[in-house]
UniProtKB/Swiss-Prot annotation:
Necessary for normal cell division and for the maintenance of normal septation. It comes from Burkholderia vietnamiensis (strain G4 / LMG 22486) (Burkholderia cepacia (strain R1808)). Belongs to the TRAFAC class TrmE-Era-EngA-EngB-Septin-like GTPase superfamily. EngB GTPase family. GO terms for cellular component: cytosol. Residues 24-207 form the EngB-type G domain. GO terms for molecular function: GTP binding; metal ion binding. GTP binds at residues 32-39, 59-63, 81-84, 148-151, 186-188. Its cofactor is Mg(2+). PANTHER family: ENGB-TYPE G DOMAIN-CONTAINING PROTEIN, MSS1/TRME-RELATED GTP-BINDING PROTEIN. This is Probable GTP-binding protein EngB. The gene is engB. The keyword Protein biosynthesis does not apply. Pfam families: MMR_HSR1. One of its GO terms (biological process) is division septum assembly.
Length: 219
């Protein structure tokens, strides 16, 4: 079958939780540090050049961007591009706004069926990456990590990054986290890991898509 993600288009932008769309379709959120390559990864996954825009000033994008997936008349899911985090020059008020927006969305959005977490393969599992995991993990829903820009690593460095990140994620299971925590190497430039990421994301959506039509509208 054709990749579901290739049928993605811009839907809406929100800056406050009260403005989140009252949709019933399942959602997959994409999160990551500024400069982790999140926008580029979304574009490659969706086979489009300019679906997700990267701000010229890292860390300045403060909105949640929604992209609908599936037929335009009857979309079956939404991809949710969350604001990048961790850029040092962002004002404190903006950081506080992002923290509230991200933590509340991840913890309470009932339509959310999984989180794709982008980490630069050269610097995985930063303190802020761990904070994202800790906000979302209590929901019991899966988190899949893309170790981006792996083309910048040697083969052995890639192996080490993958092993060490998986070890770090396994520690959360030892602490009682119930949701699946998985990781893979990914390069938008070389298209490394693209098929693996497609298959995993669509596996999250398929059972949810089957149930979405009869689900109640959630705020």
């Amino acid at each position: 079958m054709a990749f579901l993600l290739h049928q993605a288009r811009f839907y809406t932008t929100v800056n406050h939780l009260r403005d989140l769309p009252p949709t019933v379709q399942p959602e997959i959120a994409f999160a990551g540090r500024s400069n982790a390559g999140k926008s580029t990864a979304i574009n490659v996954l969706c086979n489009q050049k300019r679906l997700a825009f990267a701000s010229k000033t890292p860390g300045r994008t403060q909105h949640i961007n929604y992209f609908s997936v599936g037929p335009a008349a009857e979309p079956v899911a939404n991809l949710v591009d969350l604001p990048g985090y961790g850029y040092a020059e962002v004002p404190g008020a903006a950081k506080a706004h992002w923290e509230m927006l991200l933590s509340s969305y991840l913890a309470t959005r009932s339509q959310l069926c999984g989180l794709i977490l982008m980490m630069d393969s050269r610097r995985p599992l930063t303190d802020l990456d761990r904070r994202m995991i800790e906000w979302f993990a209590p929901t019991g829903k899966p988190i899949h990590t893309l170790l981006t820009k792996c083309d910048k690593l040697t083969r052995q460095e890639s192996i080490n990054a993958l092993r060490n990140t998986q070890k770090g994620l396994d520690a959360y299971r030892d602490q009682g986290v119930k949701g699946k925590l998985t990781v893979q190497l990914f390069s938008a430039l070389k298209r490394t890991g693209l098929d693996e990421a497609h298959e995993l994301i669509e596996s999250w959506l398929r059972p949810s898509v089957a149930d979405a039509e009869g689900a109640p509208v959630a705020q």
